UniProtKB/Swiss-Prot annotation:
Binding residues for UDP-alpha-D-glucose: T143, Q362, H377, W380, S382, E385, D401, Q402
Other comment: Leaves of the 'sweet herb' Stevia rebaudiana contain a mix of steviol glycosides, compounds that are unique in the plant world because of their intense sweetness and high concentration in leaf tissue. Stevia leaves have been used as natural sweeteners in South America for centuries.
PANTHER family: GLUCOSYL/GLUCURONOSYL TRANSFERASES (PTHR11926), UDP-GLUCURONOSYL_UDP-GLUCOSYLTRANSFERASE, UDP-GLYCOSYLTRANSFERASE FAMILY (PTHR11926:SF1417)
Induction, per UniProt: Induced by blue light and red:far-red light in a ratio of 1.22.
Keyword Ubl conjugation: no
Keyword list, A-Z: Glycosyltransferase, Transferase
Family of this protein: Belongs to the UDP-glycosyltransferase family.
Binding positions (an anthocyanidin): H23
Gene name of the record: UGT85C2
Active-site residues from the entry: H23 (proton acceptor), D120 (charge relay)
Enzymatic reactions: steviol + UDP-alpha-D-glucose = steviolmonoside + UDP + H(+); steviolmonoside + UDP-alpha-D-glucose = rubusoside + UDP
Protein name, as recorded: UDP-glycosyltransferase 85C2
């Protein structure tokens, strides 16, 4: 842990993310940006996450910098190599029962009193109470799209109105989930299947209750932060602005960070290579360099999606038969209960046009000129990175807000093709060929439009830049009170 710079009194913000890769990445980016704006930062990870960073990025990656320190609290659960896949009930129970006291104990021992807390929205189960006990304000940072938040928010209403649970399993396939819901403000045309809900899940499921109850607490907090930009989700942002006193749309964060001159970046923070909890393989960039512009499909299903060996094999044959180059990220724990090993015959076919790696710097890959398409699980981090890079998508959502993101990618933003839930090699082949061929021309143009609109949002007078400045001013005022 680094020694804090205390020669000048600065607003002091404590960040606490939900302990998962995508949440931490989005939190760290905002923390870096506010640090560059002159705020003092304490970033709190769990012990387990802290150690994962040290393993993936080296022993000095969390040394911090003047005015930026990393701290840890124990998460109270045991961990195995597959610990985060899927999110375990034991972690959620520990968050609800153990994190409050541990977090308060940490904060009260810090050398400088904090100005405010920026909490992951899904940790509001204890951070709202912590803020009250500490006597400091809290801001909620929702590291998902505004449409994803709104979807989670209205699951309670779906249950109250009798749309869920399903009467029986036949409702999964009889067209019922195509029912259009017309009473969610700002989300015209949304279908039941587009809500962030696994419709086969018991409504008493711990993960479901945890994720749907968090937005219901949002009215207890006046400041809410969303990693999106105004022009991407205007009707939903308008609805949220009427609902809460202070809304900050601040994305895409990486584009804002890219504006910081290299000489002003703090090496003790930026050494977190890609903000990844897994060691990255740089060899894929040598392979990308050998390919023509817009000729490669990038394939990555995120850090927590899992599938059957049959599904992975179908993806493999579909990609191999498409006759397009592809970079495929296959995590060791991608397959449920088995090693992620492809059949030897398929491996031979893949060698002709494919490159397989276990992890990579996704944002660098998406920005590479050879990449022309992205086969994705539609996690929000992946989605906003793809939009920022102007790369169209093939969508295979796994769960939760990925389902909502898929709807917006394909129908509202018109930059994606949706796959069926059941993976079939012929469909994979067809969609890759459509995306990369003449059929994808309109999507490529729309993707370029969104890339430009994202850059307008982060320009000096853009909506996201102005919101970051408003947030800094608000926190500075809090520090003086």
């Amino acid at each position: 842990m680094d020694a804090m710079a205390t020669t000048e009194k600065k607003p002091h913000v404590i960040f606490i993310p939900f302990p998962a890769q995508s949440h931490i990445k989005a939190m760290l980016k905002l923390a870096q940006l506010l640090h560059h704006k002159g705020l003092q930062i304490t970033f709190v990870n769990t012990d387990f996450i802290h150690n994962q960073f040290l393993e993936s990025s080296g022993p000095h990656c969390l040394d911090g910098a003047p005015g930026f320190r990393f701290e840890t609290i124990p998460d109270g659960v045991s961990h195995s190599p597959e610990a985060s896949i899927p999110i375990r009930e034991s972690l959620l129970r520990s968050i609800e029962t153990n994190f409050l006291d541990r977090f308060i104990d940490l904060v009260t021992k810090l050398p400088d009193p904090p100005t405010c807390i920026i909490s992951d929205g899904f940790l509001s189960v204890f951070t709202i109470d912590a803020a009250k006990k500490l006597g400091i304000p809290v801001m909620m940072y929702w590291t998902l799209a505004a449409c994803g938040f709104m979807g989670f928010y209205h699951i309670h209403s779906l249950i109250e109105k009798g749309f869920a649970p399903l009467k029986d399993a036949s409702y999964l396939t009889n067209g019922y989930l195509d029912t259009v819901i017309d009473w969610v403000p700002g989300m015209e045309g949304i279908r039941l299947k587009d809500f962030p809900l696994d419709w086969s899940t018991d409504l008493n499921d711990k993960v479901l209750m945890f994720t749907t109850e968090a937005p219901q607490r949002s009215h207890k907090v006046s400041h809410h932060i969303f990693h999106t930009f105004d022009e991407l989700e205007p009707s939903i942002i308008k609805t949220l602005s009427l609902r809460y006193n202070h809304i900050y749309t601040i994305g895409p964060l990486q584009l804002l960070l890219d504006q910081i001159p290299e000489e002003k970046k703090q090496t003790g923070i930026t050494s977190l290579h890609g903000y990844s909890l897994v060691k990255e393989e740089p060899e894929c960039f040598q392979w990308l360099q050998s390919k023509e512009p817009n000729s490669v499909v990038y394939v990555n299903f995120g850090s927590t999606t899992v599938m059957s060996l049959e599904d992975m094999t179908e993806f493999g044959w579909g990609l191999a038969n498409s006759n397009h180059y592809f970079l495929w990220i296959i995590r060791s724990n991608l397959v449920i209960g088995e090693n992620a090993v492809l059949p030897p015959e398929l491996e031979e076919h893949i060698k002709k046009r494919g490159f397989i790696a276990s992890w990579c710097s996704q944002e660098k890959v998406l920005k590479h000129p050879s990449v022309g398409g992205f086969l994705t699980h539609c996690g929000w981090g992946s989605t906003i990175e793809s939009l920022s890079a102007g790369v169209p998508m093939i969508c295979w959502p796994y769960s939760w807000d990925q389902l909502t993101n898929c709807r917006y990618i394909c129908k509202e933003w018109e930059v994606g093709l949706e796959m069926g839930t059941k993976v079939k090699r012929d469909e994979v082949k067809r969609l890759v060929q459509e995306l990369m061929g003449e059929g994808g021309h309109k999507m490529r143009n729309k993707a370029k439009d969104w890339k430009e609109k994202a850059r307008i949002a982060i320009a000096p007078n853009g909506s996201s830049s102005l919101n970051i400045d408003k947030m800094v001013k608000e926190i500075t005022v809090l520090a003086r009170n």
